[in-house]
Amino acid sequence: MQIKRSIEKIPGGMMLVPLFLGALCHTFSPGAGKYFGSFTNGMITGTVPILAVWFFCMGASIKLSATGTVLRKSGTLVVTKIAVAWVVAAIASRIIPEHGVEVGFFAGLSTLALVAAMDMTNGGLYASIMQQYGTKEEAGAFVLMSLESGPLMTMIILGTAGIASFEPHVFVGAVLPFLVGFALGNLDPELREFFSKAVQTLIPFFAFALGNTIDLTVIAQTGLLGILLGVAVIIVTGIPLIIADKLIGGGDGTAGIAASSSAGAAVATPVLIAEMVPAFKPMAPAATSLVATAVIVTSILVPILTSIWSRKVKARAAKIEILGTVK
């Protein structure tokens, strides 16, 4: 049976399929973890420890050395994405109620959901798209996108926008596994190779545990809103990313639109933030569902939109070249 190949046909499948299975487990048998106990309970409820190991391995996979082109491109995209998320957070905090919207079509929408959906790029999706439509340097720009993984950037955005306050040691605790992994991976290439293999392997495990925090009835209630959130992520982050790629990154905008997705890891952010700041706990389930839907939507639409953009840009460039030759 080609289970893995079938799952990978779904955009973000290795994240989303286990997430859905976990949500099924939580919806129809919410006490399964406590009933079985031991290792089974650990797999069902171990979101934070599994993610801690994943962040460590993610840090170990990043090479310190990179070309100037790669750093300029990736730095431009990462800073722009985070800046846009900060602006959205600052505006949303003045419009959306403190505990999120509780009634009506926008029920479940919160500043936490907006920031979590917008401040991370799906690095793997970006790299695969740019390998097809861009240069090797542009594809390699995902190197700094790993820095967005985890709750740190969301914490910084929420903190600096005045939405939440975090003690300094909480910031350190959030980034320490990543930094230790980063240090070890760059001190010893063999350790980098060893730990980086676990990055993809751990995704289904933390996705399943994360799914066990989601009630499918919440997803049913926020489905259409989640789709609209995914579209909003592409529009709100995509336009500034295209402009930044052209003006600063030295590209034609293709990398910008390729970076306008939501990362699968962003699905875990609401739960992790709620663990640190209990005030966010009531919002976390709906925010998780919204972000999960946004991840699916952006995973489907971003490759299509990038393909259309790339074809138009290349056709325009070819036309200009022909006109120049004629003259």
Swiss-Prot record:
Induction: Repressed by the HTH-type transcriptional regulator KdgR. Induced in the presence of KDG. The chain crosses the membrane at residues 10-30, 42-62, 73-93, 95-115, 139-159, 163-183, 199-219, 224-244, 254-274, 289-309. Residues 1-9, 63-72, 116-138, 184-198, 245-253, 310-327 are cytoplasmic. Residues 31-41, 94, 160-162, 220-223, 275-288 are periplasmic. Uptake is completely abolished by carbonyl cyanide p-trifluoromethoxyphenylhydrazone (FCCP) or nigericin. GO terms for cellular component: membrane; plasma membrane. Belongs to the KdgT transporter family. This is 2-keto-3-deoxygluconate permease.
